[in-house]
């Protein structure tokens, strides 16, 4: 009896883990694919296109795909917002990594610079023209969206879920 119950619990926990992993991975992969599809368009990678033109297009796309924001960053690592001065993101580790390696970056959760309160995960993708990095696009995924994935998966199976960050820290738990 006890061995059977243990095996059932083990299977339920494994199924919940697979479910959470698939859902979180799907959201990140979806974000990477969206950014990649935009990054190959000259209207985004070409530095001769004014930054605010890029931002206006991104603002329309943001709401459609359910992100906090999708932003343009220029080659000087400044992020642009309509109606505001460009803000430097050069001190952000993920931006330094992206601009030095040319590889997409996915962050752990952090408080968004826009308000300093909203927790989010960021997916950033480089913009390149003739092999040179001309900037990047990034999108922010609400922390609560990821937490809800954990809650739904753990509530369904009656298990607990913990999201571990890239440095082994607990990002969220149910």
PLM regions: where:
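Extracytoplasmic/periplasmic ligand-binding sensor regions of membrane-associated signaling proteins
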Residues: 63-64, 70, 75-153
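Juxtamembrane extracytoplasmic/periplasmic/luminal helical "stalk" adjacent to the first N-terminal
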Residues: 1-49, 65-67
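Short, solvent-exposed secondary-structure junction/capping segments
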Residues: 40-43, 77-78, 168-169
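Amphipathic alpha-helical segments in well-structured domains
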Residues: 10, 55, 91-95
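Conserved beta-strand cores of small sensory beta-sandwich domains that regulate signal transduction
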Residues: 36, 69-71, 160-162
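Short acidic-hydrophobic sequence patches enriched in Asp/Glu that either
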Residues: 9, 87-90, 163
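Solvent-exposed, extracytoplasmic
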Residues: 49-66, 97, 136, 140-174
């Amino acid at each position: 009896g006890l061995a059977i119950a243990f095996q059932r619990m083990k299977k339920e926990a494994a199924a919940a883990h697979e479910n959470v992993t698939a859902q979180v991975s799907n959201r990140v992969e979806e974000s990477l694919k969206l950014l990649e599809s935009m990054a190959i368009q000259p209207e985004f990678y070409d530095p001769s296109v004014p930054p605010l033109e890029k931002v206006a297009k991104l603002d329309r796309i943001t709401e459609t795909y359910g992100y906090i924001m999708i932003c343009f960053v220029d080659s000087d690592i400044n992020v642009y917002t309509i109606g505001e001065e460009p803000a430097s993101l050069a001190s952000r580790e993920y931006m330094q990594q992206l601009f030095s390696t040319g590889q997409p970056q996915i962050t752990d959760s952090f408080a968004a610079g826009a308000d300093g309160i909203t927790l989010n995960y960021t997916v950033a993708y480089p913009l390149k023209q003739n092999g040179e990095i001309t900037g990047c696009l990034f999108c922010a995924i609400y922390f609560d969206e990821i937490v809800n994935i954990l809650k739904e998966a753990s509530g369904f199976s009656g298990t607990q879920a913990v999201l571990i960050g890239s440095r082994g820290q607990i990002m969220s738990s149910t």
